[in-house]
Amino acid sequence: MSLPKKLEEMQVEEASKLAQNLREILDRWSKLYYTKDAPEVEDYEYDEKYADLVALEEAFPEIITQDSITQRVGGEILEGFTKVTHTEPMLSMGDVFSRDELVEFDNRIQKNVGHPVDYNVELKIDGLAISLIYQDGELIQGSTRGDGNIGEDITKNLKTIKSVPQKLTRPLSIEVRGECFMPKASFAKLNAQQLEDGKPVFANPRNAAAGSLRQLNTNVTKKRDLDTFIYTVVDSNQLGAKTQHQAIQMMAELGFNTNPTQEVCANLDEVWDYIAKYEGQREDLPYGIDGIVLKVNDLSLQQELGHTVKIPRWEIAYKFPPEEAATVVRDIEWTVGRTGVVTPTAVMDPVQLAGTTVSRATLNNVDQLTAKDVHIGDTVLLHKAGDIIPEITRVVLEKRPVGISELDIPTHCPSCGKELVHLNGEVALRCINPDCPAQIVARLEHFGSRNAMNIMGLGPKQIQQLYAKNFIHHFDDLYKLTSEELSQLDGFKEKRVNNLLEAIDNSRKNSLERLINGLGIQGVGTKMARTLAEKFGTMDNLMQTTIEEFDAVDTIGETLANNLATFFQSDVAQNMIDELKAVGVNMEYLGVKPAESPDGYYKGKKVVLTGKLEQYTRNELKERLISLGADVAGSVSKKTDILIAGADAGSKLTKAQALGIEILDETEAIAKFEQ
C-alpha cells in the first residue's frame, strides 16, 4: 500500500490511522518471516509497507507508539531465542546527508576538544549489527542488537559463519562488535534457489541477512553464506590500542574479518575524497553499503566526548544520496479517502531502488499526474524521497511507446459512481456523496483509531467486514454491536470478541478531545481537537459556538472557524451527536485545562519529543507535558525551548544542538515534573 497523498497534505489523525493499520500488518508478516521462515507475502510488499510506516512516523512523531515495529532497533525478541542484556548499550549513530552537515559535526568536535582531529573513515555496511564475546580466546556468546539494551542470543547461528573465529590467536577476554551481511553474489545465489523452490525472493541483501541470522534452525543459517566485518572493541584497553585505526588492525591480527578500506583522514577535504571514491565504486563492491562512517580516531578523545543516551558524540554516518531506477508504469489506480479525496497511484514493474523493491508510487493528485505527464506504458525514473518514499522523478519521453493512450482522469467516483468535483478551487478531485461506501468505511476506521476513540482490536479489516455485513454504517452502530455479530469476523473466537466488546465499551468514557478528533472535521487533528476541548469544555458548548467565537481562539483561523461552525450547526452533526449521546459516549473534557496547569518547569514552554522512550509511550508523555502547561510541537525550530530525546534520536537532535536548545533525556525530563 502506497501512501494516499503527500505527507505535508495529511492531517495527523489520517496519518495515525494509516500507521496503526501498517503496524498490525507488519507485525503479523514479521512474525511469520522471522520465527517460522514462512513469509506470507513477498519481501518487496513488506518493504513497501515498512517504508510507508517509517515515513509517517518521521513526519508525525506524535503518532509513534512504543510497540511500533520501527521502534525495535533490531526487531522483536523472538520466541525461541534467549534474551541477552548487553554489557554496554549497542547505540545507534546520528545521520547526516550533506557536506554542510559534516562541517557542523566537525565544528562541534573541534569546539569540544579544542583542536582539529583525525578521523578514521569506514564504509557503512548494510547489514545486521552483532556482538561477539570471548573468554580466554573462546567464543562464548554472540547476539543481535535487539532494542539496544537487550538482544537475542544467536551464538549457535553465528558459529556457522566462516568469518566468525571460534578461537582467537591470543587468549583474550573481550567483546567486539560489527556487522553481519550477505555478499551480493550469495544474495543472487539465494534468490535463484528461492525461485527454483517456488518460494518468494528476498527484496535485498540486508533483509536476507537478517532473516538468515535470526533462524531457529541453524542449518538454514549455515546454508545462507553470511559474512562479517568487525569494527569496534567495547574496551579498547584490552588491546592496548591508542586509535580506532590501530584497534581495527589489532582485531584483524586476532583473527577477525575487518574491512581493509578504512582510512585515516586529517581533514574534511580528505573525508570528502573518500566519500566520492566509494560512492563511485558502490555498485562494484561485493557487498552493500549505504554510506560511510566518520569516527574520531583518537580513542582517548572518544572517551572524552562520550555519548548521549542514544548516540555517540564522536561518530556520525554520512548517508549516500538516493538512487534512481527506471521502470514501466502498468496501471494507475484511483483510491477514495475519508474526506472523499480521490488519489492516483502508479502501479509499476517491480524494481530495486535504494535497497528495496518498489512497485507503487503515489502521484498525490491530478495536477501532479498531469504535470509529470505520466501515462500507462511510460518508462519513468524513480527515486526515494528521504530514501524512504518512492517518487516518480520524470517520464523518459524518448522511450514513450508510439500511440500511447491519453490520460484517463476519472469523472466519477470509483467507489460509488457519483460525479467527482473540485471544491473551492482545490487541486484534489473529490467525491461529495456522504453515502459513498469507501468514505463511510474510512470514516469508521478513523473514528476507532488510536488517536481518536482508540478502540483496540478494531482495525481496517474488521471495519470493512462489519460494513460489508451491514452491521455498521454510523458511528453509534459500533456501540450496538453484539457478540453474535462480532463472532462472524475472521479469526474472532470468544476471547477476541469479548476483548473487542470491552474496548468499545471503554471508549465511551474517553475525554471529549478524542471524540472531536474521531468526528473527522476537516482541518481538525489531534492538537486542534484538544484545543477545542480545553477551550469549550463540552460538546453542547461547541454545538452553540458561532464563527466569530471560534475565530477568536488564537490558533483558529477564519477558514477553520467557518468549517467548525458549519459542521457543529449542521443537522447531520446534531443527529450524529444525539445518536452518540444515546449510546452513552462521554461529551465532556476530562483533562486539565491550561489555566489550571501548575506553575512548574514546563509551564508555557514549547517542547518537542524525539526518539524511543522507555518509561512512557510518546502519547503518554505528551499528555503529561500538556497537563503541566507545555505546548508540545512536532518539529524543532528557533521557538523550541526543550527537546526531550529518547534512544535513536536523529535529525531533530542534531538541529536542536545546532540551535543551542535545551536537551533532556527521558529521565531528566521526568525529574523536572515536580519542579
UniProtKB/Swiss-Prot annotation:
Pfam families: BRCT (PF00533), DNA_ligase_aden (PF01653), DNA_ligase_OB (PF03120), DNA_ligase_ZBD (PF03119), HHH_2 (PF12826), HHH_5 (PF14520). Zn(2+) binds at C413, C416, C431, C436. HAMAP family: DNA_ligase_A. The keyword Manganese applies. Its EC number is 6.5.1.2. One of its GO terms (cellular component) is cytosol. PROSITE patterns: BRCT, DNA_LIGASE_N1, DNA_LIGASE_N2. SUPFAM superfamilies: BRCT domain, DNA ligase/mRNA capping enzyme, catalytic domain, Nucleic acid-binding proteins, RuvA domain 2-like. DNA ligase that catalyzes the formation of phosphodiester linkages between 5'-phosphoryl and 3'-hydroxyl groups in double-stranded DNA using NAD as a coenzyme and as the energy source for the reaction. It is essential for DNA replication and repair of damaged DNA. InterPro entries: BRCT_dom, BRCT_dom_sf, DisA/LigA_HHH, DNA_ligase, DNA_ligase_AS, DNA_ligase_CS, DNAligase_adenylation, DNAligase_N. It catalyses: NAD(+) + (deoxyribonucleotide)n-3'-hydroxyl + 5'-phospho-(deoxyribonucleotide)m = (deoxyribonucleotide)n+m + AMP + beta-nicotinamide D-nucleotide. The active site is at K124. It comes from the Bacteria. Its cofactor is Mg(2+); Mn(2+). NAD(+) binds at D43, Y44, E45, Y46, D47, S92, M93, E122, R145, E179, K295, K319. The gene is ligA. This is DNA ligase. GO terms for biological process: DNA repair; DNA replication.
